[in-house]
Amino acid sequence: MMKPVLHFSKLYEVKKLLRKSRLYTVCEESRCPNISECFGNKTATFMILGNRCTRRCAFCNVEKGFPKGVDPEEPYRLLEAVKTLGLKYVVITSVTRDDLPDGGASHFAKCIRVLKENIEDIKVEVLIPDFRGNKKALEVVLKEKPVVLNHNVETVPRLYPSVRIGANYKRSLNILKWSKEIDKSVYTKSALILGFGERKEEVIKVMEDLRSVDCDFLVLGQYYQPSLKHHPVVKYYSEEEFKEFEEIGYEMGFKFVVSKPNARSSYKAFESLLST
């Protein structure tokens, strides 16, 4: 369910800039329901390392296939786009790049470094893939001091074989656990998409698992099927059910919880930081 298209002139301005800069956003590639709101406010989650993913998650609308090589100029194009938009809080994500030895970690690090070296007081949040469980790759990213390290578990362990093909629940938890071991000053975040057929008790158990690795921020949102070839929606959750999960999350000790049908992991990212 898409939100009404607001701020049309700003929406067009951001899209025009992205095309000119040859940059991608996960907002567009994943058909995010919040795109008009975020673009209207001149915010976006930039997607580096191309727009083709080496994984085939059953819910994701990002193009699958063999990606192109890494573009060494991309961090500088990203810098110019951020400057033009006047952003002070930037979210960077990527497709999963299992074809790269470090999963793209060094490119993430370069993007963070270029932004921080050229824009005073810039805050950078990263939404990273699992780097195939490579702890050294995670260290490379954290060395550049992003303000938030986001890695999404996406669904409950039972549904991984059908929903997150190629991923591993324990590996994803380890990314969040290792992040705190490497640098406690960096906030961690994760998200769950609901509607694949998970049970309430399974969702709560995942929330408990996230707190057990000291995850700070939690996002829960409704799954909307992008096309007939994607995983079907098994259940649509009510506003009341999302509210209940939010209350449970705060009771567990999460610093900030966004639990709404249209919530996505980067939605209101800066607000989560302000809450700390």
Swiss-Prot record:
GO cellular component: cytoplasm
Designated name of the protein: Lipoyl synthase
Superkingdom classification of source: Bacteria
Manner of cofactor binding, per the entry note: Binds 2 [4Fe-4S] clusters per subunit. One cluster is coordinated with 3 cysteines and an exchangeable S-adenosyl-L-methionine.
PANTHER family with a match to the protein in the record: LIPOYL SYNTHASE, LIPOYL SYNTHASE, MITOCHONDRIAL
Family per similarity comment: Belongs to the radical SAM superfamily. Lipoyl synthase family.
InterPro entries attached to this UniProt entry: Aldolase_TIM (IPR013785), Elp3/MiaA/NifB-like_rSAM (IPR006638), Lipoyl_synth (IPR003698), rSAM (IPR007197)
A single GO molecular function term of this UniProt record: 4 iron, 4 sulfur cluster binding
Catalytic activity: [[Fe-S] cluster scaffold protein carrying a second [4Fe-4S](2+) cluster] + N(6)-octanoyl-L-lysyl-[protein] + 2 oxidized [2Fe-2S]-[ferredoxin] + 2 S-adenosyl-L-methionine + 4 H(+) = [[Fe-S] cluster scaffold protein] + N(6)-[(R)-dihydrolipoyl]-L-lysyl-[protein] + 4 Fe(3+) + 2 hydrogen sulfide + 2 5'-deoxyadenosine + 2 L-methionine + 2 reduced [2Fe-2S]-[ferredoxin]
Binding site for [4Fe-4S] cluster 2: 53, 57, 60
Lineage: Bacteria, Pseudomonadati, Aquificota, Aquificia, Aquificales
Record PROSITE patterns: RADICAL_SAM
Broad class of enzyme this protein falls into: transferase
Pfam families: Radical_SAM (PF04055)
Compartment(s) where it occurs, according to its Swiss-Prot or TrEMBL record: Cytoplasm
Gene3D superfamilies reported for this sequence: Aldolase class I (3.20.20.70)
EC number: 2.8.1.8
Cofactor requirement: [4Fe-4S] cluster
Keyword field: 4Fe-4S, Cytoplasm, Iron, Iron-sulfur, Metal-binding, S-adenosyl-L-methionine, Transferase
Domain Radical SAM core: 39-255
Pathway assigned in UniProt: Protein modification; protein lipoylation via endogenous pathway; protein N(6)-(lipoyl)lysine from octanoyl-[acyl-carrier-protein]: step 2/2
Binding site for [4Fe-4S] cluster 1: 27, 32, 38, 266
